[in-house]
Amino acid sequence: AGETGAAVFADLGPAPDTENLPAEQVYLAVAKRFALLGARNFLFETLSAEDGVLEAIRALKQTVPEAFVLVSFAVLPDGYTREGRYCAELVRRVAQSGVVDAVGLNCVSAPGAMRALVQQLGDAGLPLSVMPNAGYPVVARAQVRYQGKPEYFARELSRLAAEGVRILGGCCGTTPQHIAALRTALDALPEALPAAPAAKPAAAAKSAVETDDAFLRKLRTGQRVIAVELDSPKDADMTAYLEGA
């Protein structure tokens, strides 16, 4: 990007998968168009699954072998995407594909929650990217705003850098002030940093653990079950809500 030396990425969001046009073809068509315009860095971001993405990237690299590709997933604070995919499994599959150069998380979660998610990933064997939202959205005077302050954003992400994350940025709600604060925080870190985040020992077994779920047990034994939807609590006091549950 001119004299700054910044890398410019072609940005591709989630592609719909329809009967007439599979997601793989959508990704590939858009990526090839970017490549014809001179793009050599590609960001596939805010994904809820890897369906069609890896196939498109594999085909893209046959045409543009020097392409640098970063794949990033949108993961909720509980560790799962909106399609129910567990973040550590997604990252592992993408990292093992052999066609992706970096992998990570972006959007949906705030910096603190995303830092907790990164601790579940461990060493993916690829550079890890983290681009959280500035915070969580609130509606004020008919406008959506993110309450996360630049100082909070910079503090949490600089901790991730100290733990081995190599690509840091921001998604929804981030401003030039957030990025400037992050740059200042990163400049204050020592030059020698870990090569990759360390995983918590129990994280790898999360998806394989069989829980003692009373609801699931009844379904398996053919018992009748009743589902009841509770209205959300009216304030921060959860006492009555939990008693009703």
PLM segments and residue spans:
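Domain-level signal for soluble alpha/beta catalytic cores
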Residues: 1-245
